[in-house]
């Protein structure tokens, strides 16, 4: 049975014609006297049907006379998008939004921001919930070097942000900049978990200090933060610490994907730029065209510190570049540090010395310099600089440098290399249970040069090394060029409960989506399916039946969609 990651990736919906079915009247700059209905309770939230009523929420919140109830959009809104109609974000430093807001899958378009303390649809939220918000065609020109910018929320404290989408331009200046939220803070009793989940960013970011596709900077004082099922599609450049999902901070990140290029002046990672302390990054992927570049650069994390990185994959090129006195590190999974297990790298790892004499150059297929590295494989090439201009230059197929007393085991690499295949720890030493592998008898089998755990099959050896026979599986669908992929991944996305009754693959797809039942019996022959965009509009429907069925989705534009079938819903992406 195929357990496929059922979520996100590539361009969303609003690119398709006819997304807005009705003509929307844009904001005239005024403020409504009342909401369209409701009493502000959870069961009967205030109804917001016009831009003027949304401006009423901003006015009440920012003057301390409201913003502490529940609100719901009942129609799409246009905020005019011009200099004469600059949006004042909901919530200020003095008066935060403390209620619950449901965008109800409607769109808020043409938001224009020029002068705000915290920039976004919401400026500052506290103990709040923001969900189902679609910000599109936004223009953020706010300049506040000490501030926080996010198209959905600027600064969010103890705020659950769920199922939000950002599209537009962020041309402003802020120290913390994220496509969804600029500064994400958790300060609650330890039993509480705050979620940032099911969000997608399309915005290109030009960071000043911290920049992330989903969150610029995340911070935990007390409590638990979980960032999960999020996708970044925007490119991120210029910041000091940049990541496809989070620029830097404290967090737990699970089931996230990056498709955007990440380039910084210092530390870059496909998922995270820098982790401040202990944490975890699991079941995350940096995809093919999402190249990573920085002085310290990693396909998953730039500077991982004590972070656990497990079941993660990088498929893009990683380039570390620097000049005089720089410490240059590059790794397919982590540029530096981290506790890495059950991961693989498919991207080339390159180092460029721009000029002068760097202090250190370290390059590895998994990590430039790290702590624990266990049960991993690398197929990417290691491309050293033509002249490192330093005697402190080390290269490794898996790791160039290791910390004191590391845990290392089961390193596998594809083909033959001229560089040293062993771990470097002053001096080089042979890592236990490690060797090269080459092609087997089929496109999905790979043979170890030396038997490990009594087998020469790479996939079997990886599972034995993981002490779990389900973590790795053969790439039956050839989505990874036949190299082993992760197998036992819990169902994710909208249908993540044990009751999910079907799988879809490949995901993303180029045109044909296969549907396979998890039932003990086949699907009913006349079971109806429905494909919608994220606004809930039906784009395609039909009937499927049997143990396996295929649906032709080649007529859909590139983007993310929902497949509704047999009482469950899963996300899939068309490339």
Regions found by a protein language model. Give the residues of each.
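Bacterial Sec-dependent N-terminal signal peptides
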Residues: 1-24
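Generic marker of residues within folded, mature protein domains
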Residues: 12, 63, 356, 476, ...
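Surface-exposed repetitive/solenoidal architectures
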Residues: 23-492
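C-terminal outer-membrane/trafficking sorting elements
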Residues: 495-575
């Amino acid at each position: 049975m195929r357990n496929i990651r059922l979520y996100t990736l590539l361009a969303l919906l609003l690119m398709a014609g006819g997304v807005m079915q009705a003509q929307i009247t844009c904001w005239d700059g005024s403020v409504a006297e009342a909401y369209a209905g409701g009493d502000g309770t959870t069961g009967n939230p205030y109804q917001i049907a016009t831009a003027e009523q949304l401006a009423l929420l901003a006015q009440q919140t920012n003057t301390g006379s409201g913003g502490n109830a529940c609100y719901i959009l009942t129609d799409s809104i246009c905020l005019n998008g011009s200099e004469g109609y600059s949006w004042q974000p909901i919530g200020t430093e003095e008066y935060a939004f403390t209620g619950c807001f449901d965008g109800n899958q409607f769109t808020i378009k043409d938001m224009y921001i020029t002068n705000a303390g915290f920039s976004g649809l919401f400026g500052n939220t506290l103990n709040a919930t923001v969900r189902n918000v679609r910000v599109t065609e936004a223009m953020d020109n706010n300049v506040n070097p000490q501030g926080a910018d996010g198209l959905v929320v600027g600064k969010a404290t103890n705020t659950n942000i769920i199922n939000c989408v950002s599209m537009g331009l962020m041309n402003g200046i802020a120290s913390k900049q994220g496509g969804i939220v600029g500064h994400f803070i958790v300060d609650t009793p330890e039993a509480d978990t705050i979620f940032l989940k099911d969000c997608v960013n399309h915005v290109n970011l030009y960071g000043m200090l911290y920049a992330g596709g989903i969150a610029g900077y995340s911070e935990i004082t007390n409590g638990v933060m979980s960032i999960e099922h999020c996708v970044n599609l925007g490119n991120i450049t210029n910041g000091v610490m940049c990541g496809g999902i989070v620029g830097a901070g404290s967090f737990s990140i699970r089931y996230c994907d990056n498709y955007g290029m990440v380039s910084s002046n210092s530390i870059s990672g496909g998922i995270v730029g820098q982790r401040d302390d202990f944490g975890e990054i699991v079941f995350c992927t940096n995809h093919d065209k999402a190249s990573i570049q920085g002085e310290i650069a990693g396909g998953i994390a730039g500077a991982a510190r004590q972070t656990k990185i497990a079941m993660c994959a990088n498929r893009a090129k990683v380039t570390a570049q620097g000049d005089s006195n720089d410490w240059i590190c590059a790794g397919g999974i982590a540029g530096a540090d981290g506790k890495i297990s059950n991961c693989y790298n498919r991207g080339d790892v390159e180092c460029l010395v721009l000029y002068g004499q760097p202090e250190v150059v370290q390059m590895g297929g998994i990590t430039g310099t790290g702590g624990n590295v266990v049960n991993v494989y690398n197929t990417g090439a290691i491309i050293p600089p033509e002249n490192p201009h330093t005697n402190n230059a080390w290269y490794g197929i898996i790791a160039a440098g290791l910390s004191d007393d590391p845990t290392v085991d089961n390193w596998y690499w594809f083909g033959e290399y001229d560089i040293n295949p062993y771990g470097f720890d002053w001096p080089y030493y042979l890592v236990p249970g490690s060797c090269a592998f080459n092609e087997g008898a089929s496109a999905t089998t790979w043979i170890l040069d030396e038997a490990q755990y009594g087998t020469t099959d790479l996939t079997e050896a990886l599972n034995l090394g993981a002490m779990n026979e389900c973590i790795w599986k053969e790439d039956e669908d050839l989505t990874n060029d036949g190299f082993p992929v992760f197998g036992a991944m819990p169902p994710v996305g909208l249908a993540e409960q044990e009751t999910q009754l079907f799988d879809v693959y490949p995901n993303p797809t180029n045109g044909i989506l296969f549907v396979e039942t998890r039932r003990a019996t086949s699907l009913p022959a006349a079971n109806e399916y429905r494909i919608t965009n994220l606004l809930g509009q039906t784009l395609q429907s039909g009937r499927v039946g049997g143990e396996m069925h295929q649906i032709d989705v080649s007529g859909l534009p590139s983007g993310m969609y929902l497949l509704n079938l047999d009482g469950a819903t899963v996300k899939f992406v068309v490339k």
